[in-house]
């Protein structure tokens, strides 16, 4: 009877003492902090991955240029690139037609009204025609839509044209300031200024958008030239209206011409400094031409 009692004592005492630790062991071992620790570890990893991706993307774009390709070759699918190339051609043709008509009108205003800004705008309009023609050459070859070498050659030509046109604009504006030529206002001048300002501004926006998608410095430069044309168109109207109300501010027209000429000159120099070395780097990668 005593062993049985001992067994009963052990059996009665056994369930009371050991099971509680066993029953509480799973909650104690439950991975409560684990889900909290995983989000804490992920942000540093994600941040490191982002930094690595940013550095790799910069190195990758440099590698693309070294191989004669633009960054658009990795962003756009072939049919998308061709679609944007056709849009760039259409915008360039439209720009040539519009700016050529505005150039003729602006030259007429410059001769009839002795306007330095009108002469500067006419020169800039011709520059816009030439730059749009260069963009046409740039995208005339469907296989060269991502060609970095072709892109940089177009930019170098644009830089040279910018320098030559800026010199002509500044010389003409300084001559008008030295001879104290006074601008005149009429309906024809008003119409040319409004049309040139609006149309060139619209063309500039379109070229900037296409240049960003195609990663084309030539298109962006062409857009900058159109933007300058829009500013010059409005400046003709501004200087004429100011002179109409205050004849003492006769120098505003020539001063704007000098400022715009210097701006174009600075942009042309910057373009040549950036693009001439790249033409040399990519001269061996004309695979798409």
UniProtKB/Swiss-Prot annotation:
<feature type="modified residue" description="Phosphoserine">
    <location>
        <position position="61"/>
    </location>
</feature>
<feature type="modified residue" description="Phosphoserine">
    <location>
        <position position="11"/>
    </location>
</feature>
<feature type="topological domain" description="Cytoplasmic">
    <location>
        <begin position="1"/>
        <end position="88"/>
    </location>
</feature>
<keyword id="KW-0967">Endosome</keyword>
<dbReference type="GO" id="GO:0031902">
    <property type="term" value="C:late endosome membrane"/>
</dbReference>
<feature type="transmembrane region" description="Helical">
    <location>
        <begin position="151"/>
        <end position="171"/>
    </location>
</feature>
<dbReference type="InterPro" id="IPR027469">
    <property type="entry name" value="Cation_efflux_TMD_sf"/>
</dbReference>
<comment type="function">
    <text>Zinc ion transporter that mediates zinc efflux and plays a crucial role in intracellular zinc homeostasis. Binds the divalent cations Zn(2+), Ni(2+), and to a minor extent Cu(2+). Is a functional modulator of P2X purinoceptors, including P2RX1, P2RX3, P2RX4 and P2RX7. Plays a role in central nervous system development and is required for myelination, and survival and proliferation of oligodendrocytes.</text>
</comment>
<feature type="transmembrane region" description="Helical">
    <location>
        <begin position="188"/>
        <end position="208"/>
    </location>
</feature>
<keyword id="KW-1133">Transmembrane helix</keyword>
<keyword id="KW-0458">Lysosome</keyword>
<dbReference type="GO" id="GO:0005886">
    <property type="term" value="C:plasma membrane"/>
</dbReference>
<comment type="subunit">
    <text>Homodimer. Interacts with MCOLN1/TRPML1. Interacts with SLC30A1, SLC30A2, SLC30A3 and SLC30A4.</text>
</comment>
<dbReference type="GO" id="GO:0140882">
    <property type="term" value="P:zinc export across plasma membrane"/>
</dbReference>
<feature type="transmembrane region" description="Helical">
    <location>
        <begin position="117"/>
        <end position="137"/>
    </location>
</feature>
<feature type="region of interest" description="Disordered">
    <location>
        <begin position="1"/>
        <end position="65"/>
    </location>
</feature>
<feature type="topological domain" description="Extracellular">
    <location>
        <begin position="239"/>
        <end position="255"/>
    </location>
</feature>
<dbReference type="GO" id="GO:0042552">
    <property type="term" value="P:myelination"/>
</dbReference>
<feature type="topological domain" description="Cytoplasmic">
    <location>
        <begin position="209"/>
        <end position="217"/>
    </location>
</feature>
<keyword id="KW-0812">Transmembrane</keyword>
<keyword id="KW-0813">Transport</keyword>
<keyword id="KW-0770">Synapse</keyword>
<feature type="transmembrane region" description="Helical">
    <location>
        <begin position="218"/>
        <end position="238"/>
    </location>
</feature>
<keyword id="KW-0225">Disease variant</keyword>
<keyword id="KW-1026">Leukodystrophy</keyword>
<feature type="topological domain" description="Extracellular">
    <location>
        <begin position="172"/>
        <end position="187"/>
    </location>
</feature>
<dbReference type="GO" id="GO:0099180">
    <property type="term" value="P:zinc ion import into synaptic vesicle"/>
</dbReference>
<dbReference type="InterPro" id="IPR026765">
    <property type="entry name" value="Tmem163"/>
</dbReference>
<dbReference type="GO" id="GO:0005765">
    <property type="term" value="C:lysosomal membrane"/>
</dbReference>
<feature type="topological domain" description="Cytoplasmic">
    <location>
        <begin position="277"/>
        <end position="289"/>
    </location>
</feature>
<feature type="topological domain" description="Cytoplasmic">
    <location>
        <begin position="138"/>
        <end position="150"/>
    </location>
</feature>
<dbReference type="GO" id="GO:0031901">
    <property type="term" value="C:early endosome membrane"/>
</dbReference>
<feature type="modified residue" description="Phosphoserine">
    <location>
        <position position="55"/>
    </location>
</feature>
<protein>
    <recommendedName>
        <fullName>Transmembrane protein 163</fullName>
    </recommendedName>
</protein>
<keyword id="KW-0597">Phosphoprotein</keyword>
<feature type="modified residue" description="Phosphoserine">
    <location>
        <position position="57"/>
    </location>
</feature>
<comment type="similarity">
    <text>Belongs to the TMEM163 family.</text>
</comment>
<keyword id="KW-0472">Membrane</keyword>
<dbReference type="GO" id="GO:0030672">
    <property type="term" value="C:synaptic vesicle membrane"/>
</dbReference>
<feature type="compositionally biased region" description="Pro residues">
    <location>
        <begin position="16"/>
        <end position="36"/>
    </location>
</feature>
<feature type="region of interest" description="Required for interaction with MCOLN1">
    <location>
        <begin position="42"/>
        <end position="72"/>
    </location>
</feature>
<keyword id="KW-0862">Zinc</keyword>
